[in-house]
Every structure is written in C-alpha cells, then in structure tokens.
Curated annotation (Swiss-Prot):
GO biological process, one term: pyridoxine biosynthetic process
Subunit structure: Homooctamer; tetramer of dimers.
Broad enzyme group: transferase
GO molecular function, one term: pyridoxine 5'-phosphate synthase activity
Positions annotated as active site in the UniProt record: 44 (proton acceptor), 76 (proton acceptor), 198 (proton donor)
Enzyme Commission (EC) number: 2.6.99.2
Keyword vocabulary terms for this entry: Cytoplasm, Pyridoxine biosynthesis, Transferase
Cellular component per GO, a single term: cytosol
Protein name listed in UniProt: Pyridoxine 5'-phosphate synthase
Gene: pdxJ
Lineage, highest ranks first: Bacteria, Pseudomonadati, Pseudomonadota, Alphaproteobacteria, Hyphomicrobiales
Catalytic activity from the UniProt record: 3-amino-2-oxopropyl phosphate + 1-deoxy-D-xylulose 5-phosphate = pyridoxine 5'-phosphate + phosphate + 2 H2O + H(+)
Record-linked SUPFAM superfamilies: Pyridoxine 5'-phosphate synthase
Length: 246
C-alpha cells in the first residue's frame, strides 16, 4: 500500500494569522483536503500560537469525527507538559514528538535517541498508555534506530529537509535519499514503522516512495500549500496522492 498523505495545516494557519480575521479557515481547508482524498490532517501547535492556535484543535477533531471518521489527526510538537495536556485533551490518533526549541521557525533536526532516551521513554510510555500511536522525529541515521525502538515508540518520522533542499542538485539528492533509505531499512529491522516529512514535493516524493516502498505516511504542508495556490487544494491533494503512488 502506498504511503498515506497527511496534510499539514500550519502554513494555512500562518496565512490566516497575518490578519485578525477568520480566513482562510484552517478547518475549512482541512475539509477540502480530506474530501479530495487526503488520509489525515497534521498540526504543530507551538507555544506562541504563531500558526496553529489551540482553538483550532477541537474544530479539527470534530471535523474528522463528524465528517471523515476514517481519517487521522496527527499532532506534533515538543513534549512539554502543556503540549502533552493538549494531546490528552484533543485525542489525536498519532502524536509526533519533535525536539524543537520554541523559538525555531520550523523543525530542522531529529532526536538524539541515545542522549534523549531518559526524556523520551517515560513520555512515550505515558502516551502509549493513553492509547496514542507515537512517532519520533528522526534524522537520517541508521545507527539510532535500536535506541528509537527502545523508547517504546511505534514509528519514526524521517526528517526529509536536507533531501528537499537538494532540489537543484540531483547527485546530492540521490545521496541523501540513500541515507534516508538506509535509515528506514534499519527502522524496519528494529520493528518500527516509518513516516516522513519536511520539504516534500510532487517532484521528490516518487523517488522517496520507490526507495522506501513500505513508507507508512508522509506529512506535507509547505510544498502542498504552495502548489494549492496554483492548482487549488483539491487538485493539489490529487497530485500528491499520485506522487505517493495512489
């Protein structure tokens, strides 16, 4: 089965927040994405609410429950106590933990699974006890996969930012793709499932899907939102689904 597509709504939320107005509607755009065939919605609610607001979370949860019960809600963020409280309140199907500093513009690195084990392991245990599937943001580093598994997580999410940044250098892109592929191979061998996200496009997704055919999910926001300005949200979701292999 091809990788499922989760549409990250942060870029939509950031555009809305440029004005003190309710549009574009984060929930409304999420509805368009799901109606066009996306398998889920992702948000990263940061402490300063500079894009996704805490008030968006119950609306997205209700959208999925009431209109698209087959879809999944993925909430990602740094596992502070405030973040964990949000997760436990709004009950996403998946929680993706990222090692972000609150001031970061965007996620730009994965966990050090050995050094961060003491932090992650009890948090993963708490989330799993709550019934959540847990994914951990990961650099392309095959050596870290056993330690990732030992936290108790279900999945890793491969950070594909470097791969996406080589959009005009095919040799570097191919080299980074192989690093991602070897990390996925090690994750599968350790018993983990594999997601991927960051700077993925219809141009670079097919090669990623070919190298990692058992990829479970891709979470895409910036590139998908940029394409939606040209092709509309429904048309863009279709393009990304085809790039995944659907």
């Amino acid at each position: 089965m091809p990788a499922k597509l989760s549409v990250n709504l942060n870029a939509i939320a950031m555009l809305r927040n440029r004005r003190d107005l309710p549009w574009p509607s984060v929930t409304g755009i999420g509805r368009l994405a799901l109606a066009a065939g996306a398998h889920g919605l992702t948000v990263h609610p940061r402490p300063d609410e500079r894009h996704t607001r805490h008030s968006d979370l119950p609306e997205i949860r209700a959208l999925i429950d009431d209109e698209f019960p087959q879809a999944e809600f993925n909430i990602e963020g740094y596992p502070s106590e405030d973040f964990l409280a949000l997760v436990e309140k709004h009950q996403p199907e998946q929680v993706t933990l990222v090692p972000d500093d609150p001031a970061q513009a965007t996620s730009d690195h994965g966990w050090n699974f050995v050094a961060d084990a003491a932090l992650l392991t009890p948090i993963v245990r708490r989330l799993k006890k709550g019934g959540f599937r847990v994914s951990l943001f990961s650099d392309a580093d095959p050596a870290g996969m056993t330690a990732a598994r030992d936290t108790g997580a279900d999945r890793i999410e491969l950070y594909t930012g470097p791969y996406g940044s080589y959009h005009s250098d095919s040799a570097k892109a191919d080299k980074e793709l192989e690093r991602l592929g070897k990390t996925a191979d090690a994750a599968f061998a350790a018993g983990l499932q594999v997601n991927a996200g960051h700077d993925l496009t219809v141009g670079n997704l097919p090669a990623l899907a070919k190298r990692i055919p058992a990829l479970a999910e891709v979470s895409i926001g910036h590139g998908l939102t940029a394409d939606a300005l040209e092709y509309g949200m429904a048309g863009t979701v279709g393009r990304f689904l085809r790039a995944c292999g659907w």
